[in-house]
Design a protein with these regions (language model features):
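Short helix/turn-capping signatures at newly exposed starts of structured segments
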Residues: 1-120, 131-133, 139-172
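Active-site beta-strand termini and strand-to-loop segments that position acidic
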Residues: 125-130
Length: 172
């Protein structure tokens, strides 16, 4: 089966990074709604933090999480989703797209702080000077990006530190 991903343009990716990643943190849910509207993404009727995206404009495909009105993470697709029958063929094109977006992030934020790859799943984590995490990754069905607030990144690093010191076990 032949399938070609719809891919977010480099310029639009950088525009999203500048608005969501490089601008001041913490961000409020109201900031998230304003950014959603700025980019022209349409919200769910009953969950305004879930909305459409550039590469999947007809489906609710992006979202942000918030606790007590403060954003913890923002998740958006870099590609559309490959149909299930294409998954065996779409892994290599997805990895090419993933590597391309990793190069963009490397130019902006330096080398990835963490990389992982298990079978058809892959992910790289970049950290900005202000402590914002940018994770790009995917599988044979899609490539996506997750932006994590400095607070979420701190919590994750503290958890990893406590596991490494043996104070807590990995599954707690």
């Amino acid at each position: 089966m032949s399938f070609e991903f719809t891919v977010l343009s480099d310029d639009r990716f950088v525009e999203i990074l500048e608005a969501w990643v490089d601008s001041p943190w913490p961000k409020t849910a109201e900031d998230g709604y304003a950014l959603r509207d700025h980019f022209g993404w349409r919200p769910s009727e009953n969950k305004p933090n879930v909305f459409t995206s550039d590469v999947v404009p007809d489906e609710l495909s992006a979202s942000f999480t918030s606790r007590q009105g403060v954003i913890g993470s923002f998740d958006f697709p870099i590609t559309d989703i490959a149909p299930e029958e294409a998954w065996g063929y779409s892994l290599e094109p997805a990895k090419v797209i993933y590597r391309h977006f990793c190069e963009i992030l490397t130019r902006r934020y330096g080398k990835a702080k963490q990389r992982s790859s298990k079978k058809e799943r892959y992910r790289s984590t970049f950290v900005t000077p202000q402590g914002v995490g940018v994770k790009v990754g995917g599988n044979d069905a899609l490539v996506s990006c997750i932006v994590e607030s400095p607070e979420e990144m701190f919590i994750a690093s503290e958890y990893a530190r406590l596991v490494a010191k043996g104070y807590i076990s990995e599954d707690e």
